[in-house]
């Protein structure tokens, strides 16, 4: 059975996530941007948008009455829910998450796993959200303003994230190491809600493939979704190699 010279990847078979992480670690400095997939296109699903709910919330925030504060929190909750569902709709995850009755807290954890929120921001957002939405009190104006800023920032991040490329290609070139591989391709399959990786070798029969599906393993899917996002940013030269490795927890 043929092997690469950098590590004993068995050519012609599928990788698991740990093996793929090792592959990225060993080849990331040899990746050269090649091609990109277009962002996904979908039809608008909801009549109102997150931005409109934010506008409603801002109008209420300008009024200091108790009713306006309570209404403001309600609009912010809808802005958050609508933005999460809009983002999931883009990637054809909305129906899957609905079918599984996934709650907002879990949706936020999923978004955090994709790299949109760090753990501290996620905890802070959930703590404020729980206090605002579940306690029978008139919320403090300072807390509302913090909540408003957090929701606005997340809406902006997910709006931008919905227009990220649905895939990217890299050539594999290195003067310092010998590798049997010459191309890395990662793509999002909107129809099957899965992420497909292909690592091309010199001979087609020696190509390595790796696919993870939201339907079968949501944790692995979330990680590979983050890989796709990080490699897109690497392709755009927005982030460096070492930062991508840290974000993907590859040591």
Feature locations, PLM:
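Charged alpha-helical initiation segments
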Residues: 10-69, 163-167, 179, 238-251
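Charge-enriched, short contiguous segments at helix-coil
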Residues: 43-46, 112, 117-168
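Amphipathic, well-ordered alpha-helical segments in soluble domains
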Residues: 49-56, 75, 82, 121-128
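Short, charged/polar, low-complexity loop and linker segments
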Residues: 56-63, 102-106, 133-134
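Short, hydrophobic, well-ordered secondary-structure elements
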Residues: 58, 68-89
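Short, charged amphipathic alpha-helical segments flanked by flexible coils
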Residues: 88-117
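N-terminal accessory interaction module
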Residues: 172-248
